[in-house]
């Protein structure tokens, strides 16, 4: 017992001593309503060190979860993705992002965790590697042998002009993902780099980008996205999407900047319909970014919605296996609901309605309230059919795991609203779920309760 107490005391002394590190002077962490709010400021290496130090236990948890979950899902161990990240991503990262990742590693080491830059790079690029690079390799060997791997992440909208209450931008997004992953998408990061613009975004522990993509900056740029269902394509010579998305948040000052940054070196991975706004002009855009095809819609008076459906006919035909005519698919069913919402709420859209939209349970196909794959606040764990287009079988534990929204007025003050857990506020409880669905018990090592939380305001504070 005395030895145990001595070890605990020594550990606490070590942590306190490290907390006196001058690199942590401008950093902070606060836990609120299921979220971890962090403030990071300084050079790339300082920002990375602060991130790694403040979120060390959570980064360790996320890395262990991913190694376990990915192996269980696609039968590839972490070493495969490390090798790919080291070869395809690390050499192409701009120096400031390499330095930030190396800083994260140093912060982790200061807390006693032995990960390296390749682990953190693979973590940041895991969606690109698991859902785009791996299918690309498999389909090169045997055509169409690994389709339907592009993740079905998210329901979102952006509106402006006569569609909103004040004529300015309203933007909102909920994250659809496997619950074992999404319940860890619980960081709000306020980043003040020495170069570029201040960023406020959600992310996972260890991410240098948002990942599900909801970000605003102090130049007036804001963006979100929904993934393109059943997209196929990857360019090994391209730049990692996670770096381009971070760069757009840090250096973008306009919609044109965003498009240029995202298109430069496009590797096709994490192909999305991006919803982008500029609070200086209240112009919005929908940027449908495939590998071969890109289409842009722009307006100062309209509402663009997303639920993982592509709109450009050439992109759908040439780069996906998506069926736009299948009304029972999750993307198309949610698209129908979005169309109803747009028609009924034109001229009224504001912050409170945005929160309601992201927690919406009305199944437009069935004409009633339900919890399933067809509603904006998705609950695949309640769906007896499942979401085949995302490779989610019946009752697979996945769906909407959190939501965010902001407006022109809020974004100009670097503020956003966020809700951890289902945006509708429903709890997901692991034990009763596994009792009903033991086929998913293998996820029990990391899948835990996901309690509903209130909408909470976050804002950039300090220098």
State the predicted function of each range.
Residues 10-18:
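Hydrophobic h-region of N-terminal signal peptides that target proteins for export
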Residues 19-256, 263-268, 275-300, 327-463:
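N-terminal mature-domain region immediately after signal-peptide cleavage
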Residues 2-9:
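Sec-dependent signal peptide recognition
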Residues 300-329:
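Active-site-adjacent segment of 2-oxoglutarate/Fe(II) JmjC oxygenases
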């Amino acid at each position: 017992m005395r030895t145990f107490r001595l070890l605990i005391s020594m550990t606490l002394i070590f942590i306190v001593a490290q907390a006196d590190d001058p690199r942590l002077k401008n950093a902070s962490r606060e836990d609120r309503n299921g979220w971890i709010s962090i403030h990071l400021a300084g050079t790339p290496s300082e920002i990375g060190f602060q991130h790694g130090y403040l979120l060390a236990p959570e980064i360790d948890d996320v890395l262990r979860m991913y190694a376990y979950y990915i192996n269980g899902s696609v039968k590839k161990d972490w070493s495969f993705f490390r090798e790919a990240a080291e070869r395809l991503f690390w050499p192409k990262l701009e120096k400031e992002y390499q330095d930030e990742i190396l800083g994260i590693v140093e912060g982790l080491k200061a807390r006693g965790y032995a990960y390296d830059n390749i682990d953190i790079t693979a973590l940041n690029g895991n969606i690109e590697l698991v859902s785009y690079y791996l299918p690309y390799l498999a389909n090169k060997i045997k055509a169409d042998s690994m389709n339907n791997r592009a993740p079905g992440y998210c329901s979102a909208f952006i509106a402006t002009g006569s569609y909103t209450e004040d004529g300015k931008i309203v933007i909102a997004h909920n994250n659809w993902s496997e619950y074992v992953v999404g319940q860890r998408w619980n960081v709000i990061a306020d980043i003040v780099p020495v170069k570029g613009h201040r960023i406020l975004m959600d992310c996972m522990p260890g991410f240098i980008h948002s990942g599900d993509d909801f970000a605003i900056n102090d130049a007036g740029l804001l963006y979100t996205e929904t993934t393109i269902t059943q997209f196929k394509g990857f360019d090994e010579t391209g730049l990692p999407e996670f770096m381009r998305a971070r760069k757009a948040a840090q250096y973008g000052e306009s919609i044109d900047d965003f498009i240029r940054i995202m298109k430069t070196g496009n590797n096709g991975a994490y192909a999305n319909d991006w919803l982008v706004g500029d609070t200086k002009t209240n112009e919005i855009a929908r940027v449908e970014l495939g590998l071969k095809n890109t289409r842009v819609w722009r307006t100062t008076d309209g509402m663009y919605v997303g639920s993982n459906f592509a709109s450009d006919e050439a992109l759908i035909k040439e780069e996906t296996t998506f069926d736009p005519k299948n009304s029972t698919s999750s993307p198309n069913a949610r698209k129908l609901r979005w169309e109803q919402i747009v028609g009924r709420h034109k001229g009224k859209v504001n912050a409170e309605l945005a929160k309601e939209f992201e927690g919406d349970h009305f199944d437009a196909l069935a004409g009633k309230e339900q919890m399933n794959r067809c509603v904006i606040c998705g609950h695949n764990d309640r769906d007896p059919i499942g979401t085949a287009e995302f490779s989610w079988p019946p009752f697979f534990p996945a769906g909407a795991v959190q939501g965010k929204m902001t407006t022109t007025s809020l974004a100009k003050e670097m503020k956003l609203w966020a809700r951890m857990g289902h945006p509708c506020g429903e709890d997901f409880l692991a034990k009763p779920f596994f009792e009903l669905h033991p086929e998913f018990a293998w996820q029990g090592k990391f899948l835990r309760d996901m309690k509903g939380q209130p909408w909470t305001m976050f804002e950039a504070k300090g220098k």
